[in-house]
């Protein structure tokens, strides 16, 4: 394995940990000092709630809420950073902010908290990238994502108490838009037959198509 490939794997394994670690630091600190952060959540169509576009994904109701988002963020973050490195950082910012803005515009007027909108955005991006890009890698990733996270589609339906289904739905919509906008970024490298490896023959051993003995003509 080349040094660049090792570096890519290490980078993809470390960077996706940063955001979940930040979430845990915030939650543990709030628990330790008895601070209730829910009012820093996103309150739709309220000017004071605009701050929640940035702060809401950082806040979680309890440990189960936080844990349910932690592992998908790490796994999906690794996949995106490894297979779509050029778009990965901007994708995170795009899904983070656009999902929040859409929730602020369209969602119910209750406090919305948690990073699940980002999770849904990541899942949607990976799934629809397979449809838009149509290369083998993207299609394979889309199938894997469908197998691992296909059941989360139920989280986009209204009716479940204590669930911001709007964040889930609008995160998925944002991921779909991102998959289309970035469909030509990080294309798979084209490989030709002659790139498979060095020639396994010696040019001196090649047969010559011209044989002077067989090409004599009687005059």
Where are these regions (language model features)?
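A detector for small-residue-rich transmembrane helices and their helix-helix packing motifs
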Residues: 1-219
